From Swiss-Prot:
Membrane-spanning residues: none
Official protein name in the record: Phenylalanine--tRNA ligase alpha subunit
Complexes and interactors: Tetramer of two alpha and two beta subunits.
Gene name of the encoded protein: pheS
Cellular localisation: Cytoplasm
Length: 344
């Protein structure tokens, strides 16, 4: 019996492991209810030991049990910390080349959006947000879109099949309607966000993109205020030498309406591929709020007037960083995105 205890003691002391499976094997073999140590206590050999040595024999067996438990904890610690030279947790070889762990950066759309917001924030504009799933009233009717307007067709707008009155917003002008409904003039706000159009995805178009639209409503607001606001924005965003021009246009929610161009900051107005040799690049649309839009928001157009403007963030980003394919913004190509890690 003593020889068996000595043999088990030596085996336990010399036991080593390289995996969790071997650790579990040790536990089952020596510490479980059916293990070797428990079997010795319950076995025939121990029961037949002479009474005068049974006490000392029991003490030796208890020492063996304590040794097994201690050894198990020691092996467990070594496995967890990787301090066992033979374990699967190998020591770190400091001579090996380091695998670079690069930190992420901001997306170019976010960079430009924050730049735009910073400029307008300095001019006293606050930030507004609204739902991307919008109802027909806020997306079309309140903005003076007639019933037969092409934007209401399925070719241009994503409608919810179960409820045709619900759409994916086609512009963030719907946010401006909600602001006017819930806030009394003076109102000065910008509303950036995702918008959706039923368009085929290509290098120049996408079904989802980002807009930022501005709204100013107060007494005696004029087109001159609109021009000065966008003039200041253009110089802050694209450089102090930037010039702007307005071309007559049409939008249902503004009258008069205009398209805004800026002098090409790539060629300084001399003509290049970016501006198609014209010296000008289109940035967005703007105009004075149509009185019907104010009436729909329960604002008296005889007392208040206002202007609105909108521009595509992707377009500004593409111009600013000379990006030629719109799809790059949504493809998550790390080679493309890492170029903007330190962009300003």
């Amino acid at each position: 019996m003593l020889d068996k205890i000595k043999e088990l003691t030596q085996t336990i002391e010399d036991f080593s492991i390289e995996s969790k499976e071997q650790l579990e094997q040790f536990r089952l073999e020596y510490l479980s209810k059916k293990g070797k140590i428990t079997s010795m206590f319950d076995g025939f050999d121990f029961k037949t030991v002479a009474p005068e040595i049974k006490k000392s024999m029991g003490q030796e067996m208890n020492k063996l049990k304590v040794l097994a438990q201690t050894k198990f904890e020691e092996l467990q610690d070594k496995l967890n910390t990787g301090s066992n030279d033979n374990s699967v947790y190998q020591k770190i070889d400091t001579s090996l080349p380091v695998i670079p762990n690069e930190l992420g950066g901001r997306h170019p759309i976010n960079i430009v959006r924050e730049q735009i917001y910073t400029v307008f924030e300095r001019m006293g504009f606050n930030l507004s947000d609204g739902p991307e799933i919008e109802d027909d009233f806020h997306n079309f009717t309140a903005l003076n879109f007639p019933e037969n307007h092409p934007a209401r067709e399925m070719q241009d707008t994503f409608f919810i099949e179960r409820n045709p009155d619900i759409v994916l917003r086609t512009h963030t002008s719907s946010v401006q309607v909600r602001v006017m409904e819930n806030q009394k003039p003076p109102i000065r706000t910008i509303s950036p966000g995702r918008v959706y159009r039923n368009e085929a995805i290509s290098a120049r178009a996408h079904c989802m993109f980002h807009q930022i639209e501005g709204l100013y409503v107060d007494k005696n607001v004029s087109f001159a205020d609109l021009k000065n606001t966008l003039y200041h924005f253009s110089k802050e965003m694209f450089g102090k030498d930037t010039q702007i021009r307005f071309r007559p246009s049409f939008f249902p929610f503004t009258e008069p309406s205009a398209e805004m161009d800026i002098s090409c900051f790539i060629c300084n107005g001399k003509g290049c591929n970016i501006c198609k040799q014209s010296g000008w690049v289109e940035i967005g649309g703007a105009g004075m709020l149509d009185p019907n839009v104010l009436i729909n928001a329960k604002i008296d157009p005889k007392v208040y007037s206002g202007f609105a403007f909108g521009m595509g963030i992707e377009r500004i980003t593409m111009l600013k960083y000379q990006i030629k394919d719109l799809r790059l913004f949504t493809e998550n190509d790390v080679r493309f995105l890492r170029q903007f890690k330190h962009a300003e």
